């Protein structure tokens, strides 16, 4: 166990060094990339993230969002939900924002933002155990949670649930924040919030739980899939996706298979609610309805034909060919049942079969023989 931890730590240090070297020229890294390549794969606890940020900063790397804005920009946004449309509230997602969300945004929108000096004073007070300062620091950054949470809408959780999970991460950030390291609180809290939300999505959003690092890999693959769709004008092949993501086609197929969502058999089909998906899926264990119906009709026709024979003839055929229990018997076995010789049973059987071959009887069974 200890060796595994040492190996993981060594691998992580190598990855961080490579990350800094690859971004040294630009001096900038996207926050999503930091999360996907460093935070999630190594399942960093949030208290370890500040050390990572410090190492990146010391390495000359600044953290931004995908639009190139500093990752702290969310903390200074004014939220006025009454002036925003659903699309503006949730970015490019098409989900509708309901009244509870708007009410919540209105409530947090009236909380005044903090200046750098106020933030520092509150952080010091929190370290000294001031509960009121802790509450003020958290409330002033609730809109940060909203801004981050809206980037994860459409991944299987309701917007308010994402906000709730993000708020849990925010509270942890308030407890652990160390102002003396020089980071703005919003920079530090962002990672706690993102980690709380991504873990919640991995744990709750899917019927079958998928590890956090795999969830991020799936999300990245889906993004590349969409980009290729726009570039090519058609759905990309696993080979094309693999080339873009620097992995093998087999690995892409494996990820796509993992990404598939289970579908409930109770899923409604059509406009009426009385039809469900399960109604249209064949049960391979149960006998095919057509075969079952054919077998029942054959049994009925056979019984009718056998009724035209004598009782002894009928019973001999039933025993010889196993018509009742599926077990065929020899002439000798049947002879013992009737206490006659096997030759006598052969004669009775031959006479019964001649009768069945007569057109008046055979026509009832001929269709089944031809099928």
UniProtKB/Swiss-Prot annotation:
Keywords: Cytoplasm, DNA-binding, Sigma factor, Transcription, Transcription regulation. Residues 216-292 are annotated as: Sigma-70 factor domain-3. Residues 331-350 bind DNA. It is found in: Cytoplasm. The keyword Coiled coil does not apply. One of its GO terms (cellular component) is cytoplasm. A motif (Interaction with polymerase core subunit RpoC) lies at residues 161-164. Residues 305-358 are annotated as: Sigma-70 factor domain-4. Residues 137-207 are annotated as: Sigma-70 factor domain-2. It holds the Pfam family Sigma70_r3. GO terms for biological process: DNA-templated transcription initiation. GO terms for molecular function: DNA binding; sigma factor activity. Interacts transiently with the RNA polymerase catalytic core. PANTHER family: RNA POLYMERASE SIGMA FACTOR RPO, RNA POLYMERASE SIGMA FACTOR RPOD. Sigma factors are initiation factors that promote the attachment of RNA polymerase to specific initiation sites and are then released. This sigma factor is the primary sigma factor during exponential growth. Belongs to the sigma-70 factor family. RpoD/SigA subfamily. This is RNA polymerase sigma factor SigA. It comes from Streptococcus mutans serotype c (strain ATCC 700610 / UA159).
């Amino acid at each position: 166990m200890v060796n595994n931890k040492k190996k993981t730590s060594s691998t992580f240090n190598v990855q961080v060094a490579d990350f800094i070297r690859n971004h040294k020229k630009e001096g900038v890294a996207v926050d999503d990339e930091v999360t996907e390549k460093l935070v999630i794969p190594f399942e960093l606890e949030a208290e370890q993230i500040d050390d990572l940020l410090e190492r990146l900063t010391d390495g000359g790397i600044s953290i931004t969002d995908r639009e190139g804005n500093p990752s702290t920009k969310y903390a200074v946004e004014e939220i006025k939900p009454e002036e925003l449309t659903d699309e503006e509230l949730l970015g490019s997602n098409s989900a509708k924002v309901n009244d509870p969300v708007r009410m919540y945004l209105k409530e947090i929108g009236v909380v005044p933002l903090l200046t750098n000096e106020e933030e520092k004073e509150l952080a010091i007070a929190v370290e000294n155990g001031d509960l009121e300062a802790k509450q003020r620091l958290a409330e002033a950054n609730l809109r940060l949670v909203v801004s981050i949470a809206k980037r994860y809408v459409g991944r299987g959780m309701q917007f308010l649930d994402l906000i709730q999970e993000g708020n849990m991460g925010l509270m942890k950030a308030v407890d652990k924040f160390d102002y003396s390291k020089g980071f703005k609180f919003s920079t530090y809290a962002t990672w706690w919030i993102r980690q709380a939300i991504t873990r919640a999505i991995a744990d709750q959003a899917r019927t079958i739980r998928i590890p956090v690092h795999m969830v991020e890999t799936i999300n990245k693959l889906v993004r590349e899939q969409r980009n290729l769709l726009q570039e090519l004008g058609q759905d990309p092949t696993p080979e094309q996706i693999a080339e873009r993501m620097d992995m093998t086609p087999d690995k892409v197929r494996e990820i796509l298979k993992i990404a598939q969502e289970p579908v409930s058999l109770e899923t409604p089909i059509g406009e009426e609610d009385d039809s469900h998906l399960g109604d249209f899926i064949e049960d391979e264990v149960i006998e095919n309805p057509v075969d079952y119906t054919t077998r029942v009709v054959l049994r009925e026709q056979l019984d009718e034909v056998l009724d035209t024979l004598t009782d002894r003839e009928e019973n001999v055929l039933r025993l010889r060919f196993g018509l009742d229990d599926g077990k065929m018997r020899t002439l000798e076995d049947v002879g013992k049942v009737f206490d006659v010789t096997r030759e006598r049973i052969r004669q009775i059987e031959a006479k019964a079969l001649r009768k069945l071959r007569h057109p008046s009887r055979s026509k009832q069974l001929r269709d089944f023989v031809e099928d």
